[in-house]
């Protein structure tokens, strides 16, 4: 699930790394639960964020925490905060 916290004025998200092919960039998939307005059933929604990984330490499947940052490129506005769990 995507946990949304505020770190000062910056948003903090938790997700899973789905790609680490680009240099110093990871793609993080963040899932969230949304309640359907008519059927009252919870539905999983996901969003992908590109995040800056300065030391290329993340791998596919790692659970990470990312924090909102200044724009680094057209799609990169997030920065790797910490690795919560390494993939096996």
Curated annotation (Swiss-Prot):
Subunit note: Part of the 30S ribosomal subunit.
Gene Ontology CC: cytosolic small ribosomal subunit
Pfam families in alphabetical order: Ribosomal_S17 (PF00366)
One record GO biological process: translation
Keywords assigned by UniProt, alphabetized: Ribonucleoprotein, Ribosomal protein, RNA-binding, rRNA-binding
Protein name: Small ribosomal subunit protein uS17
This protein's record includes keyword rRNA-binding: yes
PANTHER family listed in its UniProt record: 40S RIBOSOMAL PROTEIN S11 FAMILY MEMBER, SMALL RIBOSOMAL SUBUNIT PROTEIN US17M
InterPro entries cross-referenced by the UniProt entry: NA-bd_OB-fold (IPR012340), Ribosomal_uS17 (IPR000266), Ribosomal_uS17_bact/chlr (IPR019984), Ribosomal_uS17_CS (IPR019979)
GO molecular function, one term: structural constituent of ribosome
Matches recorded under SUPFAM superfamilies: Nucleic acid-binding proteins
Record family assignment: Belongs to the universal ribosomal protein uS17 family.
Signal peptide: none
Stated role: One of the primary rRNA binding proteins, it binds specifically to the 5'-end of 16S ribosomal RNA.
């Amino acid at each position: 699930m995507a946990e949304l916290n505020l770190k000062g004025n910056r948003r903090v998200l938790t997700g899973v790394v789905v790609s680490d092919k680009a240099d110093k960039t990871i793609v993080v998939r963040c899932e969230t639960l949304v309640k359907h307005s008519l059927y009252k059933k919870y539905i999983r929604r996901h969003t992908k964020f590109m995040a800056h990984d300065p030391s290329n330490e993340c791998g596919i499947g790692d659970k990470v925490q990312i924090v909102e940052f200044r724009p680094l490129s057209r799609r990169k506005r997030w920065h790797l905060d910490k690795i919560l769990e390494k993939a096996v």
